[in-house]
Regions:
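Aromatic "clamp/platform" in nucleotide-sugar-dependent glycosyltransferases that forms part
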Residues: 257
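Conserved acidic donor-binding segment of nucleotide-sugar-dependent glycosyltransferases
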Residues: 289-290, 294-301, 310-316
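Conserved donor-binding/catalytic core segment of Leloir-type glycosyltransferases
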Residues: 4, 134, 170-191, 197-201, ...
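A short, well-ordered alpha-helix in the C-terminal region of glycosyltransferases
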Residues: 303, 310, 317-332, 338-344
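Short hydrophobic beta-strand element within catalytic cores of glycosyltransferases
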Residues: 274-277
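Active-site proximal beta-strand in glycosyltransferases
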Residues: 83-105, 112
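Membrane-proximal helix-turn-helix segments that form the acceptor-binding/catalytic region
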Residues: 110-133
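Nucleotide-activated donor-binding/catalytic signature segment of Leloir-type glycosyltransferases, i.e.
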Residues: 218-236
Length: 354
């Protein structure tokens, strides 16, 4: 079978490893950056608004794929939907909720309303014409099935290579410390960090480091930088600096208002760090509450403080949780397992020659 993978720039690192493992299993793959072969309106690059699909057509003609796999519903997926080649979508987030949030926040002006409506239209066309949708967690699978009652939908988690996550010296932090590694690009996710002031006040001896950036940074930073024990590091180079950061922290905290399958939660556990995460979306599927760390209720600084105190005051128990976390991620989300899941889903629905 010949599989063409169109990946977004933010996920191409992971898709390279995914494609490599599929090659080991006898699947001929070709991985491309999706926007290099298909773009148009809306696009951040004005010159691409009137792009033709000739590069995409040539790619299809030269490679002759049996199946096309994408990790987002953009122009590459849309062009695929116009062919007779089966389109398989790895759905990484709640597309419909994100469209709604965008309309309510960043896309209120008339030009941006037009753009978000076009993204919505493209997405619906891609979903409608796809052969298989693979949401990234069971929580998202349930949401997707409610929208597409007749469409094949199966969960496919994010694969991760444990060999990439090893302790590496570099970044030096003050201790004890809590590491937060998340972006501020979606307000409903980012605004959960506004519960931190109450925790920072109660834990003046604990240093909190936020590695991340995004359009909502300035809505968050002014409230947190008032505290001497809060430090903002900005966005970190991936994966090297992220690995150094996770090597150095004592506890990892995911403080998010909505999330499906945060990769950083997998990475922190592979780095043998005890984790604390907001109990939202698909987050509970990526950890064992009470075993590899703790889930905390949304908008509950009191519980966050209590769970952080448990981990920081019992170093030996926290260490054991971190060790269990690495084993949990290795066993459940390794490349070999997720690639087998992917191929089994294709076989189940007679997609490609498996």
């Amino acid at each position: 079978m010949k599989l063409l993978i169109g990946a977004s720039s933010s996920k191409i690192f992971h898709m390279q490893e995914f494609a490599g493992k599929l090659e080991e299993k006898g699947i001929e793959t070709k991985l491309v950056l999706d926007s290099d072969f298909a773009d148009g309106f809306p696009s951040r690059k004005l010159k691409n608004w009137f792009s033709s699909n000739e590069k995409f057509k040539k790619l299809i003609k030269d490679f002759k794929p049996d199946v096309i796999f994408v990790d987002r519903v953009r122009h590459f997926a849309l062009e695929t939907s116009k062919t007779n080649i089966p389109l398989v979508i790895h759905l990484r987030g709640d597309h419909w909720a994100e469209i709604t949030m965008a309309r309510e926040t960043l896309y209120k002006s008339m030009p941006k309303k037009f753009a978000i409506n076009k993204w919505d239209e493209i997405g619906e066309n891609c979903f409608k014409d796809s052969r298989l949708i693979l949401p990234i967690c069971n929580h998202l699978t349930k949401i997707t099935k409610e929208r597409y009652l007749q469409k094949p939908v199966e969960t496919m988690y994010q694969a991760i290579n444990p060999e990439n996550w090893f302790h590496e010296k570099g970044i030096e932090l003050n201790h004890p410390c809590v590491g937060i590694l998340q972006s501020a690009t979606i307000w409903d996710k980012a605004k959960e960090m506004l519960i931190l002031p109450e925790v920072l006040e109660k834990m003046p001896h604990v240093h909190f480091y936020w590695a991340g950036d995004g359009v909502y940074r300035e809505k968050i930073l002014p409230l947190l930088e008032k505290y001497e024990n809060f430090h903002w590091l900005g966005a970190l180079e991936y994966p090297g600096k992220v690995r150094e950061f996770l090597s150095e922290i004592d506890v990892y905290a995911l403080i998010s208002g909505i999330d499906m399958s945060p990769l950083t939660l997998q990475e922190a556990q592979l780095m043998e760090k005890p984790v604390i995460a907001t109990n939202v979306g698909g987050v509970p599927e990526l950890m064992n509450d009470g075993e590899t760390g703790f889930l905390v209720a949304k908008d509950n600084p009191k519980e966050l403080f209590e769970k952080l105190s448990i981990l920081l005051n019992n170093i030996e128990n926290a260490k054991k949780m971190g060790e269990k976390g690495r084993e949990f991620i290795k066993n459940n989300f390794n490349l070999d397992k997720i690639c087998n899941d992917f191929l089994n889903h294709l076989k189940k629905y007679n997609i490609g020659d498996i």
